[in-house]
Amino acid sequence: MSDFTYLGNPNLKKANVQQEWTEEQVKEYARCMQDPLYFIQTYVRIVSLDEGLIPFKMYPFQKEMVGTFHKNRFTICKLPRQSGKSTTMISYLLHYSLFNPNVNIAILANKAATARDLLGRLQLAYENLPKWLQQGVMSWNKGSLELENGSKILASSTSASAVRGGSYNIIFLDEFAYVPSNVAEQFFSSVYPTISSGKSTKVIIVSTPHGMNMFYKLWTDAEEKRNSYIPIEVHWSEVPGRDEKWREETIKNTSEQQFNTEFEC
């Protein structure tokens, strides 16, 4: 069995391993390919603070996010803290990389460490997939991965130099409101031409609001249909378990100002 593992990791399949398929697996693979929501809800595992490794049970707004990502090229999401926005995003990117060959995906965050953490969560979900759903692994480290189908994922900080010179099918910008305005503007002026040159390339921006900046401008323009982004807004009360009692307790343990900043989008 060790002959089939990537660098001795029993949870990863190396490249050029012949897969023997059952009829049921062929049907299931086809269903997963066609339906990202089915794939995520059936096969993606995430780490819960209270329960450890568990299936990803999606909230209604998370399902809406995935559907919007899948059907549109440009999406911008405004969500409160700790709402599962990043988990939703990496689950979609996992599906996209598995079932679309030769795609390049960039996971970009305001800090490189945050981007690497997001990639790490995607890698954990990947390791917990059945082997017949996995692509063979070509390379696998803290900053990037490459699969046998030619798809690659890069994790980096959001900067013009991060993806300059490369062509990307999906650019995911996490907590974009926290990227300094000058960096955000340089990034878009450098990267947008390569994105706009494709017909199926995607830009997905997900953030908690943070003042008047490029995220604010893109969000406002999306709401008023001055750009091509599809806006998705989630209120803290849409997250199960968050009610008025939770709000009052959170304010008591922090402050009303902090609550308004992080949860009252």
Language-model regions: role of each:
Residues 2-265:
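Phosphate/NTP-binding elements of NTP-utilizing enzymes
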